[in-house]
Structure formats: C-alpha cells, structure tokens
Amino acid sequence: YMHEVVDAVTQGNKDGILEQKPTLVNLQCDIDHPTQAMADMLHIIHEFGGVENLKGKKIAMSWAYSPSYGKPLSVPQGVIGLMTRFGMDVVLAHPEGYEVFPEVEAVAAENAKKSGGSFTKTNSMAEAFKDADIVYPKSWAPFAAMEKRTELYGNGDFEGIKELEKELLAQNAQHKDWACTEELMATTKDGKALYLHCLPADITGVSCEEGEVDASVFDRYRDPLYKEASYKPYIIAAMIFLAKFADPADILKKLEEKGTPRIFE
C-alpha cells in the first residue's frame, strides 16, 4: 500500500498536479518498523560510545509474554533486519510457533554474513540472554496465525476468527514463563545488559498481572528507555531531510558554517 501511495504522488508531481513530491515515511507496517528500529540503534550507539564499538556485541531479540496475543511482528523484524548490518551477534528467541516472516530472517542472515556478525535462532529465552550486551524482550503474534486471520477476515468468516482467537489466547498462556526477570538479567554480560523496549511495555504487577518484564527491571531502566523513545522524532526528521536534498551532508555543513543560532530566546 505504501509503495502504491509513493507511486501515486510521484506521478502527481511528474504530471504537474503536485508542486512538490511529498516524502512518505513508514511509521510502521506489517513487515518493518524502521523509525523504531533506527531510534533503538541510535540509543545503542550512544550507550556504547559509537558505531565502531558495536561489532561483536550480542543482542537478544526475544519474545516475551503479554496478556495481549496480537502485537505486531514489525519491531522484532525491524531489529533483526537492522542490527545484523553492524556486525552484531543477533539472537532471535521465541517459543515454537512464534516465528517471524521467513523473508525477514533471510535478510537478517545475509546482513550478518556481509557485516561479519551472526544471526542465530533459539527457542530458549535463557540461552538468548546469557552474556548478552543488549536485551529486547517483547511480545508479538505468530506469523502463521496472522496469515490465517487475514484469510478469515477476507472470507468474512467471523466465527472462524472467534475460534482462532481462543486458540491463540490458549497458546499464549502456555508461555507465561517467558518474562524479563531479575534472574534472567543477572545472566547477561556482567549482569548489566542494556534493556530496550519500544513502549508501552506490559509490566508485571503494574499494567498487568503477568507481563513482559518485572517492575524492578523496568524501573531501573526507565530513564534510558525514555531517551530511547525520544530519538524517534529526530529519526523521522532525518528521513524527511535525506529525501529532500541530493547532498544532505553538504547542506548540514553549510548550515554549520553559517552559524545561525539554533536556540531562539
């Protein structure tokens, strides 16, 4: 759909109907969440002191239990697709049956091969967290189930949708032990892995009875999480800026040389 919109506005600009070609920014789709993944990456770069320090760092992108079974796959897919480009050791962890798009896994594997990193999968949250530098525990819906739901909606089979929802809730409830606990965090690199989340997180004992993360873990990383979230508007602005100029680096250099005050009082 987004590609169709881009084609339409491009044609409108070419035909003189639109004076300018609008920039389309993907704020989230079924496949990817680029603004979130890049905000995550910018946060990681800041925390580890530069992009040159990311090679060999282990990041665990792990499924985690949430009372809501139908969360998008775009965040884990965006993360494994981007982080593998920087030579990181990316581990995708989830219970059996919670696979992501196979096409995205293929992209992640190819990226890791090119960057000198690695991309591995496991059905053990503990294995993923062990000695990890970064952890990203988050719930998502099974890809196969979302395909089935789309088919049912397309056929107008609302009874089938109700039955599928019951099945998914039952499947989801079997994995309440997939949670980011203090015990799991203690197994990470020096017990101090960077905890990431796209927010809002399902916090055990706060927003739900049982959720993705222990309240004590979330509270300890609350300030870094808000910093992580704060990067997103700048990521979006950068995307628009890059789309508007042929040589954005030159534009930024000229703005710096001009010395125009950035803060007006």
How does the language model describe each region?
Residues 188-265:
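Adenosine-phosphate binding glycine-rich loop
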Residues 145-209:
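ADP-ribose/adenylate-binding Rossmann-like module
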Residues 18-22, 110-120, 191, 220-222:
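A short helix-to-beta-strand connector/capping loop
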Residues 45-151, 155-159:
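Glycine-rich phosphate/diphosphate-binding loop of Rossmann-like nucleotide-binding domains
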Residues 18, 53-55, 84, 183-192, ...:
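Short, conserved loop/helix-junction motifs that constitute active-site signature segments
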Residues 23-27, 33, 39, 61, ...:
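General beta-strand structural signal in soluble alpha/beta enzymes
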Residues 1-45, 203:
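Phosphate/diphosphate ligand-binding glycine-rich loop within oxidoreductases
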